[in-house]
Amino acid sequence: MSFSVRLTEVAEGAHAYIQDDGSWFVNNSGILVGSRQGLLVDTCATVNRTRELLSTARGIGLPPNPLVVATHHHADHTNGLSLVEPSAIIAHAEVPGEMAAAFAIPPPGLFEEVEWGEIEVCSPTLTFEDRLSLDLGGLVAEVVYCGTAAHTRGDSYVYLPDSRVLFAGDLVFNGVTPFAAMGSIPGWIDALSSLAELAVDVVVPGHGDLCDASVMRSVGRYLRFVEEVAGGAVEAGVSPLEAARSIDLGEFAGWLDAERIVGNLHAAMAGLAGSAVDLIGVFVDMKEYAGGRPLRCIA
């Protein structure tokens, strides 16, 4: 099986592994190779996709048993961890608990059929609260917690200060609709403000093509748009699905996975009400918004 992937050198010893088209469960990774150690930033959703990632990484010098940073707990970024045989799995302290409560493979019927393979869930072996500095040998990688619940409760990013490269994880989507149902929209907006203070020339988003720091403004505009719609929906007494169906997505209409507007409205409206997000309701309503069919997934 072949996949559409692109490998781009973003700094000496650092490559972005971009999987097209960045939609549901099709994420990006990073491959860092120093003189002393190698590091992967995230794995992939399926066994076959992770094997492709590892084959590519080894072809450019990734040594056996590298470090792996899991930028957050979601399955598209962590399902392949067992295949890597890492020396350590690094993640924020919130991630082990979130992994234990999440699904590695979504329930049948929510998404189009995917050949996931035999998934073995691997929890992080090295957690941190704020940040870690990793000297790989001629290549320093800063692993930093975003400071707040955002896309999830445990998002971190990998920053290469010497080359001004940011592996943003799912704090940044480029041309793909962000998804906040397991995090916090106000927190995500705050996290983007913090990211914008970094000196960055190249951003490797969690999903979508390589970009520059202006992408953070685009994601921020979308999240503020969701907040505005949610406020109106609460005032009008309509449901997230009803609100989503009533609006024009405007500049965001061309982004992939547009049905996430429903899940994001669930999150924003629950936040305004001080209640928990009904994740089952989120996926049921997104599927309904998409015409009642399983959600498109090419993973």
Whereabouts are the PLM-identified features?
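Metallo-beta-lactamase
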Residues: Q37-L39, T43-V47, S133, V140-G232
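Conserved beta-strand hairpin/beta-sheet module of binuclear metal-dependent hydrolase folds
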Residues: L7-T56, S156-G169
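C-terminal regulatory/interaction regions
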Residues: V238-A299
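Acidic/histidine-rich helix-loop elements
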Residues: D21-G22, A102-P108, E115, V176-M182
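Basic/polar N-terminal segments that are highly enriched at the extreme N-terminus
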Residues: M1-E12, C297-A299
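Short Pro/Gly-enriched beta-strand edge/turn motifs at strand-loop
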Residues: V10-Y17, E112-W116, G137-V144
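Divalent metal-coordination and catalytic microenvironments
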Residues: G13, L32, D42, A57, ...
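Active-site HxH/HxHxD metal-binding segment of metal-dependent hydrolases
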Residues: N48-R51, S55-S133, R153
